[in-house]
């Protein structure tokens, strides 16, 4: 699967899509393929505050449990409730249906510090 150019990426394999003063966050195709079949997703509540580079939830697969790290700081304004009933969406549609949280940014400049698609591809040895 190609890496979408319109997104930014963290070194912990989260993607960020900017929508005005908010961002949508999910995990990358690379991350879900490394994890294997996702069986459970734990996400924060609406209203929770995220701090960049700090854990904000977890993803459980048949192989392991992996923490999710916030690529940016801000307040959670929406959570993808579908993932509690259909965690497999993370495997099936990591960049669309399986977004995890929407966050109102506290510092928009944090987005610019994230990796471009090209840099993320280099980091993960994907073309």
Swiss-Prot record:
Lineage per the UniProt record: Bacteria, Bacillati, Bacillota, Bacilli, Bacillales
Residue numbers bearing the N6-lipoyllysine modification: 63
Membership in a protein family: Belongs to the GcvH family.
The protein's required cofactors: (R)-lipoate
The species this protein was found in: Bacillus cytotoxicus (strain DSM 22905 / CIP 110041 / 391-98 / NVH 391-98)
Name listed for the protein in its UniProt record: Glycine cleavage system H protein
Gene3D superfamilies, A to Z: 2.40.50.100
PROSITE patterns noted in UniProt: BIOTINYL_LIPOYL, LIPOYL
Subunit and interaction comment: The glycine cleavage system is composed of four proteins: P, T, L and H.
Pfam families, per the entry: GCV_H (PF01597)
Listed GO biological process terms: glycine decarboxylation via glycine cleavage system
Function text: The glycine cleavage system catalyzes the degradation of glycine. The H protein shuttles the methylamine group of glycine from the P protein to the T protein. Is also involved in protein lipoylation via its role as an octanoyl/lipoyl carrier protein intermediate.
Gene: gcvH
Signal sequence segment: none
PANTHER family in the cross-refs: GLYCINE CLEAVAGE SYSTEM H PROTEIN (PTHR11715), GLYCINE CLEAVAGE SYSTEM H PROTEIN-RELATED (PTHR11715:SF3)
Entry keywords, A to Z: Lipoyl
Domain Lipoyl-binding: 22-104
GO cellular component: cytosol; glycine cleavage complex
Cofactor binding notes: Binds 1 lipoyl cofactor covalently.
Keyword S-adenosyl-L-methionine: no
């Amino acid at each position: 699967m190609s890496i979408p150019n319109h997104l930014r990426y963290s070194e912990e394999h989260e993607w960020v899509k900017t929508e005005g003063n908010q961002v949508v966050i999910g995990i990358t195709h690379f991350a879900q393929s490394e994890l294997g079949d996702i069986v459970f997703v734990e996400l924060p509540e609406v209203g929770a505050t995220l701090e960049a580079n700090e854990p904000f939830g977890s993803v459980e697969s048949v192989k392991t449990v992996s923490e999710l790290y916030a690529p940016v700081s801000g307040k959670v304004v929406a959570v993808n409730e579908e993932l509690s009933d259909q965690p497999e969406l993370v495997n099936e549609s990591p960049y669309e249906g399986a977004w995890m949280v929407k966050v109102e940014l506290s510092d928009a400049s944090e987005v610019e510090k994230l990796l471009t698609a090209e840099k993320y591809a280099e980091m993960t040895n994907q073309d």
